[in-house]
């Protein structure tokens, strides 16, 4: 497994220069920097090639995450919205190919966060999303990108709340590059048993996000990391494990993620760096170290 972190751990806004974090995450002991597709909307090919070179020179893999807005909703009943969404993803996937990014994950089958003041048509949205994700998934395949559908908690999304729903959805899409993405923060809310959810995903699991129940760094809370790591080992998962911690309030990030208090305990950038380095070292040991015992999940 390779271990990464999402750039927004250090940021209060989404649309920033994310290149600055390539060397930082390398120095802190990570293999991966996950970037937001938001910054790719208005970026030149030269800028993409510069970022690709920086990552390659540093020995850092890039992955991409995104929470699409309502105008990029593949489940929409409005044909113009769907047309716009497919055009958006086509553009983004071609840019990911230039960046040598092979994984995109997020609520990229609907939109985020959902506006629950409007009526929800889950059955209709499901059918539309399956058809349109099938189209986009084939484009992803042509670009060498796995299109990973994140299972979200009920407060942020409604189409895919459990791994069982995601597995059914992915089976209906039936495109090899369309995979399941699980996130321990969301799983902790919706899954009866996180280990069973991971086992159910099996070889359809394409991307894995980690964070504590309150979105702090792994090791800062009470998540059953040994059991989670054991389940990943049991299914032979050897892909990416990316931390998505959100610990600072304020700005667009804090508002969108609903961080209303300082979970960093007043940490400056140096303290944030030290905490991240300690967390990835902890997770490497728990998930792949000598104490990893997954016999209990194979009963």
Write out the residue ranges for each language-model feature.
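Histidine-acidic metal/acid-base catalytic patches
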Residues: 1-11, 16-26, 100, 160-182, ...
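N-terminal small/glycine-rich loop or linker at the start of catalytic domains
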Residues: 1-9, 63-76, 108-117
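Active-site-proximal loop/turn and secondary-structure-junction residues that shape catalytic pockets
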Residues: 9-11, 37-39, 68-70, 108-112, ...
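Active-site acidic/histidine proton-transfer and metal-coordination neighborhood
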Residues: 15-17, 56-57, 76-179, 191, ...
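Catalytic domains of carbohydrate-active enzymes, especially glycoside hydrolases
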Residues: 18-39, 92, 98-100
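Conserved beta-strand positions in the central sheet of alpha/beta enzyme cores
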Residues: 34, 64, 105, 148, ...
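Glycine-rich, proline-tolerant flexible connector loops at the mouths of alpha/beta enzymes
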Residues: 34-56, 108-117
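Short acidic, glycine/proline-enriched helix-loop-strand junctions
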Residues: 43-62, 145, 253-266
